[in-house]
Amino acid sequence: MVSPVLALFSAFLCHVAIAGRICPKPDDLPFATVVPLKTSYDPGEQIVYSCKPGYVSRGGMRRFTCPLTGMWPINTLRCVPRVCPFAGILENGIVRYTSFEYPKNISFACNPGFFLNGTSSSKCTEEGKWSPDIPACARITCPPPPVPKFALLKDYRPSAGNNSLYQDTVVFKCLPHFAMIGNDTVMCTEQGNWTRLPECLEVKCPFPPRPENGYVNYPAKPVLLYKDKATFGCHETYKLDGPEEAECTKTGTWSFLPTCRESCKLPVKKATVLYQGMRVKIQEQFKNGMMHGDKIHFYCKNKEKKCSYTVEAHCRDGTIEIPSCFKEHSSLAFWKTDASELTPC
């Protein structure tokens, strides 16, 4: 028969042994939480693992009881990110992504000519949904362009009802005698507005001066405006240096103001020369002088080789320099051969 004292002592030792086998704080699992979370647990106490928001369990146990051994069983629970649905194809745009898992972001961009109607990025939420919603790519349009003062639409073809699409162009022109400052063509931009509009300004030019030894004609009106024209001419024996017609430009000046150049009096009475590739006689072709800008070739003699060569002479505003090698042939020296009749060197 066991002594009551011995039995009580044995029970005490057993209680101490059992009470001493507590479980430690459980291992941390990626993306999971433990309830209740303590530093130690008595045998028989339970814990429950839960995946954090945005994550779901893939295999393994979630509920555990602290055993008498004081050692937690091996935990094979896996918490993995939620996966949001495929974002789909963004019509007229592109979706950029690396993953559809929580908490990844995806971004959106539209093709040229389209703009994002919605957000530029979306996030995979804890619930496995995209937020904000997936956007759409809408066409970029520009409203009808404002017409500048004193301007008209020269070429306007809206391609979206009354609106124009991205990169559509409009061409303007100014009313007569108004000068356009800027580009006559504007374009619908990616911001949905037009590039800078031109201006149409009234431009006046002063009356063109009459060239010395010449004349000028222009419209008989109080003011000469942009695109008005003036014509010039010279008196006899003078030649116009420059175009016969000038135009009032958008800067308020004339495109050109020509001058009248004096003709050249040839100090040679008689000679055969080359003019425009033909042999002509000075006394016949240039009896009234040689016009400014004209050029002729005089024949010169190479006495050693008994042949001829030509030297150019140019009339410049009443002045011409006769080549020093040229010798005017005298009709009295009939036995001498004129240089123009010799064989070319």
UniProtKB/Swiss-Prot annotation:
Signal peptide: 1-19
Record-linked InterPro entries: Compl-Cell_Adhes-Reg, Sushi/SCR/CCP_sf, Sushi_2, Sushi_SCR_CCP_dom
CDD domains: CCP (cd00033)
Chain segments carrying region Sushi-like: 263-345
Tissue: Expressed by the liver and secreted in plasma.
Superkingdom: Eukaryota
Keywords (A to Z) from UniProt: Disulfide bond, Glycoprotein, Heparin-binding, Repeat, Secreted, Signal, Sushi
Residues bearing glycans: 33, 105, 117, 162, 183, 193
Disulfide bridges in this chain: 23-66, 51-79, 84-124, 110-137, 142-188, 174-200, 205-248, 234-260, 264-315, 300-325, 307-345
PANTHER family in the record: BETA-2-GLYCOPROTEIN 1, COMPLEMENT COMPONENT-RELATED SUSHI DOMAIN-CONTAINING
Protein task: Binds to various kinds of negatively charged substances such as heparin, phospholipids, and dextran sulfate. May prevent activation of the intrinsic blood coagulation cascade by binding to phospholipids on the surface of damaged cells.
Protein name (record): Beta-2-glycoprotein 1
Organism: Mus musculus
Gene coding for it: Apoh
